[in-house]
A protein has these predicted regions:
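Hydrophobic transmembrane alpha-helices of multi-pass small-molecule transport proteins
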Residues: 66, 88, 128, 137-159, ...
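Glycine-/small-residue-enriched transmembrane alpha-helix faces in small-molecule transporters
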Residues: 2-57, 162-189, 211
Length: 303
């Protein structure tokens, strides 16, 4: 007996299911990588590595790794230079300034307080995107963002968390979600549609490294003996996270990408529990559930 379901229809159905899970997987993967790197950055500045080195050297290492990948694949050519303006602004807004602000702020802030401010990234993105993407903004997307923010705040604003920090450090940390949001919007609106994601990630990181490396202590040959390993690990994680970022940017907008901030917060607090021995709380359990609801609402909203 012949099947009543045409192969092409079945294939489209399977592809549709795959696309539904694709965005949440990107959000969770990128958010987890970024959260681990924030924890490593906190550790790096704690053992005495200068904040500017923590912000820039892993970025340069990630650029080298991605450039090496392009050379091995034979994909490095003159066309990579076409998008230099994109490399400059996407890198400044979404990478260099947030990295510098976060490493300087983490000298004084604990990870929980810093996580509160990272959680503001979706809110700033929502505010920045209103003039440009109002047609794609639905009540389910807005609700998804709000639920995600509540999830992150539920684990960072509990009475057990110490949030007494210098105002200067809080002000610097506030720059992180503001510039991350601006970077989200710029990348989505200026994204070169046919560009290779690896080329974009490598080009952006390389240009930013050329700008900022002269300001690091590495140019003078000054290294913390036990800091090389953590910076190398951060470089590897950064390379993977930026590669995933540009792949994800092809299928989402600034609002969609902003959901990464919620994952960063929840995963960051989870790392605090395992690394610093903080207790497993009901707030964290509730946050994970709310985060899943947030991702579902946003990724199943009709434009």
């Amino acid at each position: 007996m012949k099947s009543l379901i045409k192969p092409t229809a079945a294939k489209r159905h399977i592809n549709g299911i795959g696309r539904q899970f694709q965005s949440p997987l990107y959000v969770i993967s990128i958010g987890s990588l970024v959260a681990v790197n924030f924890a490593l950055a906190k550790y790096a500045v704690t053992i005495g590595i200068p904040p500017i080195d923590v912000a820039i050297i892993p970025m340069a290492g990630a650029a080298i790794l991605l450039m090496t990948l392009l050379v091995m694949r034979g994909q490095l050519n003159r066309t990579a230079l076409v998008h230099y303006r994109y490399y400059l602004w996407a890198g400044l807004l979404g990478v260099a300034i947030p990295n510098l602000a976060s490493t300087y702020a983490l000298q004084s802030l604990n990870t929980s307080t810093f996580s509160v401010l990272v959680t503001l990234s979706p809110i700033f993105t929502l505010l920045f995107t209103l003039p440009f993407q109002g047609s794609s903004l639905t009540w389910r997307k807005v609700l998804g963002i709000m639920v995600g923010v509540v999830a992150a705040l539920s684990v960072t604003l509990s009475p057990q968390m110490n949030t007494s920090s210098p105002w200067s450090a809080l002000a610097i940390a506030l720059l992180v979600p503001i510039f991350l949001a601006a970077g989200n919007i710029y990348r989505s609106r200026a994204f070169p549609p046919l560009a290779n994601p690896i080329v974009l990630a490598a080009g952006m990181l390389t240009l930013q490294s050329m700008i900022w490396l002269p300001f690091t202590h590495a140019v003078d040959g000054e290294f913390i003996p036990n800091g090389t390993g953590v910076l190398a690990l951060m470089a590897s994680l950064s390379a993977l996270s930026y590669l995933l970022t540009f792949r994800f940017q092809r299928i989402t907008d600034g609002l969609g990408f902003s959901q990464v901030g919620n994952v960063v917060t929840v995963v960051g607090v989870s790392i605090g529990i395992t690394w610093y021995g903080e207790p497993l709380t009901l707030q964290l359990i509730a946050a994970v559930i709310l985060l899943l609801i947030s991702l579902y609402l946003f990724n199943h909203a009709k434009s």
